[in-house]
Amino acid sequence: MSILINNGNDYQLNSSETFNSLKSSPSSTSSLSSISTSSSSSCHKRSKAVDLNRNTSNSQNSSISTAPTTATAANTTPRKTSITIPSKLPSSWIPLRNGNIDYSRYYNTNQEEDNQEQQLQDGEPLSAPTTNNGTTKTATANANIIQDSFETIPCFSSTTNTTITSSRSNPTNSTPTSNDPSFPKQMINWNQFLQEEKDMNDNSSTINDDDKTFYMEQLNLNVGQTPNNNNNNNHGVSETENDLLPGTSKSLIAKYHYQLNYGDENENETNDVREYEYGGGESRKRKSSTTSDDRRPRRGGGGGGSRTSQVFRNTLNKFTFKPKIK
């Protein structure tokens, strides 16, 4: 029997030998470290596979393993774009307390608005919204729901790994699916969102194709392209940040940011537009406006007192990890 190696060396094996040794031609500088074969009396069978592992030594003789092997044909399925989100991340990645994300490490947990205050306990996880969300303090049964901006930040509470799979055939209208019922479905028209982003930007900063690709890929919950941190990037995300959050994609966070900043704004025919003051009071004049009274809040918020925008920026910049792509 003759075995041909990639480098062209021809190894001869006499039929009388019992796989205890292997002799190669004198000109060869390579040798075999092991051969595994199944015991089959018929030729040309797939099960008679020979596994060749070349040794890096200069020895001309190498032992051969006689352990039989079984060749099993694996069923192949088309590759799916999916992401497995660990239920509990190692503490070296993000701060954890009793298996939950320690949000108190990143922002002030005292939130006040209209004489309403709710304290996020140290290490208490934020929860997905429920049907009985209110505008006042929650009851005991709904104690984990944080009011105002925090009540709509979705997080996973499952104890098993969560796999999210979505289709790329129609990214604008595709809806992510998950084996975790607590994961929120798509909740915004992204073409409208992108147009709103363009309207918000001034002449020196517009949403380009790279940014649109970033949003579309985030919508599909894939590891997308993070825009460079330059004039074309108003997302508050550095170039080195990862593109997914624990249980929440940046696109969903951006959706909530958009909803909280502009969801209650109503521009009527009388041009009676409210002046928005976030924290430092920094606001931006719309590009298409001719009056200084037509303003909207600058994305990302103002100074240190910005409650909504700064929290979302902290969320985007801090709660990141590298997901595993199957």
Curated annotation (Swiss-Prot):
Chain spans, region Disordered: 19-91, 112-137, 161-184, 222-245, 276-326
Keywords in alphabetical order: Virulence
Biased composition (Low complexity): 21-42, 53-78, 117-137
Taxonomic superkingdom: Eukaryota
Keyword Nucleotidyltransferase in record: no
Keyword Methyltransferase in annotation: no
Induction: Expression is induced during infection and decreased by benomyl treatment.
Disruption phenotype: Leads to strong defects in host cell damage in a model of human oral epithelial cells. Exhibits reduced survival following co-incubation with a human macrophage cell line and causes more severe kidney pathology following intravenous murine infection. Also leads to higher levels of interleukin-1 beta (IL1B), following incubation with murine macrophages.
Function description: Virulence factor involved in pathogen-host interaction. Modulates host pro-inflammatory cytokine interleukin-1 beta (IL1B) expression.
This protein's name: Virulence factor CaO19.6688
